[in-house]
Amino acid sequence: MYPAHLLVLLAVCVSLLGAASIPARPLNLYQFGNMIQCANHGRRPTRHYMDYGCYCGKGGSGTPVDELDRCCQTHDDCYGEAEKLPACNYMMSGPYYNTYSYECNDGELTCKDNNDECKAFICNCDRTAAICFARAPYNDANWNIDTKTRC
């Protein structure tokens, strides 16, 4: 094999290894984060909602600690309902991977009419949650809690 071919092969392998180490993040979560920022006018970073109470973040169990945590529980339940829809029950079409069309105008969120049934349902789950987050008080004491003892 020629040295130039080996260099190209090595470069491809290195780039593939680098891409494999990037953690996958469902695309819909980016949209949901943007909706949250729209609804709360950027007053609180989205990451503050990722590990809040018993339901905000991955998973969820127990009794919500406050109104904001109830918003997350309702959002989780909404995604659960989306997964039951025939339009949303095939691979990569569920709530975490299905992107949708929406608009943000001065804090007002609108799910666009061009979304199919699954996308419209998921968009409405995210829209409702983002509005709920914006209205609910944020208690710093409920961020990054020990869910094993408090939930």
From Swiss-Prot:
Enzyme superclass (EC): hydrolase
Subcellular location: Secreted
Signal peptide annotation: 1-27
Tissues/organs with expression: Expressed by the venom gland.
Binding residues for Ca(2+): Y55, G57, G59, D76
Active site: H75, D126
Manner of cofactor binding, per the entry note: Binds 1 Ca(2+) ion.
Disulfide bond sites: C38-C104, C54-C151, C56-C72, C71-C132, C78-C125, C88-C118, C111-C123
Gene Ontology process terms (BP): arachidonate secretion; fatty acid biosynthetic process; lipid catabolic process; phospholipid metabolic process; positive regulation of fibroblast proliferation
Cofactor(s) annotated in UniProt: Ca(2+)
Keywords: Calcium, Disulfide bond, Hydrolase, Lipid degradation, Lipid metabolism, Metal-binding, Secreted, Signal, Toxin
A Gene Ontology term for the protein's cellular component: extracellular region
GO molecular function: calcium ion binding; calcium-dependent phospholipase A2 activity; phospholipid binding; signaling receptor binding; toxin activity
Superkingdom in the source lineage: Eukaryota
Coiled coil, from the record: none
Known catalytic reactions: a 1,2-diacyl-sn-glycero-3-phosphocholine + H2O = a 1-acyl-sn-glycero-3-phosphocholine + a fatty acid + H(+)
EC number(s) recorded for this UniProt protein: 3.1.1.4
Family: Belongs to the phospholipase A2 family. Group I subfamily. D49 sub-subfamily.
Reported function: PLA2 catalyzes the calcium-dependent hydrolysis of the 2-acyl groups in 3-sn-phosphoglycerides.
Protein name: Acidic phospholipase A2 2
Organism for this UniProt entry: Tropidechis carinatus
